[in-house]
């Protein structure tokens, strides 16, 4: 079972790199349903969410990536791809808020974190 999940994951990545999003989506979904180790699971969730976004399935991308961020709150890449999906889904304010969170949590702002937080809180 795990070997098949890994095989489907590898196929998904190959399709993704080749720009064959529809095929990638099917393989990512199957790999995830079969069960992947934690590191591969994170990568598959990111790849699937990104592929959903690329085929304009913004609602699916946002839902999947929100769940992924809830499952892996320390994963900055998932947070960034959630922000991209939100932006593509015409939810620009939420996208900026998501980017603000990941920026404030992971970037070296050289002592300007409080100021950046203030400005992010007052974007309007």
Give, region by region, the residue ranges found by the protein language model.
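Short coil turns that delineate tetratricopeptide repeat
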Residues: 2, 36-39, 73, 107
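TPR/TPR-like (Sel1-like) alpha-helical repeat modules
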Residues: 87-108, 121
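Start-of-helix register in tetratricopeptide repeats
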Residues: 6, 39-43, 77, 115
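N-terminal alpha-helical interaction modules that lie
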Residues: 1-11, 15-17, 122
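Alpha-helical adaptor scaffolds
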Residues: 10-71
């Amino acid at each position: 079972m795990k070997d098949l999940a890994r095989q489907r994951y590898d196929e998904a990545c190959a399709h993704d790199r080749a720009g064959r999003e529809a095929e990638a989506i099917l393989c990512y979904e199957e790999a995830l349903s079969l069960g992947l180790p934690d590191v591969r699971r994170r990568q598959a969730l990111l790849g699937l969410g990104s592929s959903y976004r690329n085929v304009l399935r913004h609602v699916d991308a946002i839902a999947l990536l929100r769940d992924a961020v809830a499952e892996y709150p320390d994963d900055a890449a998932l947070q960034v791809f959630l922000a991209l999906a939100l932006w593509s889904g015409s939810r620009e304010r939420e996208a900026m808020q998501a980017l603000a969170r990941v920026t404030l949590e992971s970037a070296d702002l050289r002592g300007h974190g409080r100021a950046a937080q203030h400005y992010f809180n007052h974007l309007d």
